[in-house]
């Protein structure tokens, strides 16, 4: 099915695929398309929800910050994958895929932000309250995003880093970065 982007961000990605196909067709370039879903892991920028929460937990645990996590909606669900699995997948796809192919890099399972926060609170071993902050809320938030990794798995790729390990590595890296 052709893409049907629902947000400006998704539209920009669909446009890049169109542009990539034009370059591929006009110049005979080997172009493959990778659609990584939400990814996280060590060194992820605090501008994004999961590392923002990890950073707040570091401040609570190590700096005595008030034990409150501020975030947007905790009920949106995302297919979340570790950045190292994404990097490995991109290399494998580039080396194995035919030009013009499209691959999703995802795990095929969704997690609510609430589930992720609860895992991170366990990792940090702290007690916190949650507060909704409209500054973290996105307009036109899509409540559920989940991908199908079948095509990537058909060439031998699969996510190998568990959500718990990814979040633990992110938290520990944030501790070192503090």
Give short role names for the model-derived ranges.
Residues 50-52, 147:
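Short, hinge-like loop/turn segments at secondary-structure boundaries
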Residues 38, 44, 75-78:
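Heptad-repeat alpha-helical coiled-coil signaling segments
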Residues 42-44, 48, 151:
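Short beta-loop-alpha junction of Rossmann-like oxidoreductase domains
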Residues 1-33, 40, 44:
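Catalytic helix-loop patch of NAD(P)-dependent Rossmann-fold dehydrogenases
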Residues 57-178:
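C-terminal substrate-binding subdomain of Rossmann-fold SDR/epimerase-dehydratase oxidoreductases
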Residues 21-25, 54-55, 95:
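Alpha-helical segments that scaffold the active site and NAD(P)H-binding pocket
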Residues 32, 39-40, 49, 86:
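Conserved sequence/active-site signature of Rossmann-fold short-chain dehydrogenase/reductase
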């Amino acid at each position: 099915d052709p893409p049907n982007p629902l947000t400006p961000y998704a539209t920009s990605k669909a446009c890049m695929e169109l542009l990539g196909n034009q370059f591929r067709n006009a110049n005979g370039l080997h172009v493959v398309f990778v659609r990584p879903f939400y990814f996280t892991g060590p060194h992820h920028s605090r501008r994004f929800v999961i590392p923002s929460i990890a950073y707040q937990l570091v401040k609570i645990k190590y700096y005595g910050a008030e034990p409150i996590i501020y975030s947007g909606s905790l009920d949106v669900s995302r297919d979340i994958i570790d950045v190292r699995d994404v990097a490995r997948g991109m290399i494998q796809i580039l080396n194995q895929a035919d030009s013009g192919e499209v691959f999703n890099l995802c795990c095929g399972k969704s997690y609510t932000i609430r589930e992720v926060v609860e895992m991170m609170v366990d990792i940090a071993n702290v007690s916190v309250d949650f507060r909704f902050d409209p500054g973290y809320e996105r307009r036109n938030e899509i409540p559920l995003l989940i991908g199908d990794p079948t095509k990537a798995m058909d060439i031998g790729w699969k996510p190998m880093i568990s959500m718990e390990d990814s979040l633990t590595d992110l938290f520990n890296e944030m501790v070192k970065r503090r």
